[in-house]
Amino acid sequence: MMKKMRGIGRSGRCGRPGAGARRGNDAVARAGKRPAPGDRLYNFSAGPATLPLDVLEEVQGDLVNYKGSGMSVLEMSHRGKDYMEIAAKAESDLRELVGIPDNYKVLFLQGGASSMMASNCHNLARATDSADYVLTGAWSVKAQKEGAKLLKNANVCATSKEQNFTTIPDVKDWNLTEGSKFVHICSNETIGGVEFKEVPDVGDRVLVADMSSNYLSKPIEVEKYGVIYGGVQKNIGPAGMGICIVRDDLIGNARADTPSMFDYKIMADNDSMYNTPPCFTWYISGLVFAKLLKDGGLAAVEQRNIEKANVLYNAIDNSDGYYVSPVDKRYRSMMNVPFTLAGGADLEKEFLAEAKAEGFEALKGHRSVGGARASIYNAMPKEGVEALASFMKDFKARNA
């Protein structure tokens, strides 16, 4: 079973990790055959997404009998000693990894970012209040629509809709509302592939950021935010949990009609265990935090991500227009790289089919924009991005 899990590759070039890739052998040649059943693929899914192989193997080794406890984490009571230690270590490691100040709470919540789009409104504003939203793509649009249900005014203070969400409006042009309770951004748009490169200066207003798709991809200046939130299923762990980092002074002001599960004070007072939490996702996320610490922290993570993104963007930019990135170069995402083929829809279809046959999984662009998209989160090895770039070059040579 372990052998299959590792996905030992056959000889020759293939678009998936094999024994050579894990040893640093970056020799690549086009395979042209579908990977054998049981081999691991290069998974470019936008989420749920690829997880670190060593973390998966640790989970596999402990799955039936966790650290000699006689049971699986899947079976443990969240109130039991073993699980309480797992949960406490996960929070401690996350605080160390990110450098979270003592005046911020860390909440491990069910529902993901979509739920927190609503719970932020319940905790930070009354129904008669206003909040400002910067629209840079599908997820910030979704957050604003949720805010419009719960606030008197969910003001669109800036939008790049006219540019098809391929850029980010300059902060000096944002039309912020007097007295607004918070300013909401999505730090990285998974679908459109645009990413904030600096924390926007909104003065003394409360900045709220959905970081679902670039959580832990680089250092975070936590003190510049009031709330940082996001689902973990893209860059941290399996689906089923969101992590919310909230400044203390923003806790305890929830509306009277706020559901208990949305009330940040209730969740903080109960150490995120007001009800049974998403235990297994929390556990695996904790393993990822520990791994990132061991691997050098977020500065090292960022450097690896820059190198990976450069490989892919260089493949696009040096293709003489064969591959096209629609995104403003100033705001290109390190995590999600959408691109099209200048040859049109039929050629894109052929590209995606060949890529899948060679072990490059989930490259199809989001249904709302089409084209292709490679999500290259923390756990995607550089060898995977290099293999994709090589395949792209080869495909062009055969089809130009």
Task: Show which residues each predicted segment covers.
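Conserved active-site segment immediately N-terminal to the catalytic lysine
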Residues: 208, 221-233
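PLP-dependent aminotransferase-like
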Residues: 114-183
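Active-site C-terminal subdomain of aminotransferase-like
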Residues: 232-314, 328, 398-400
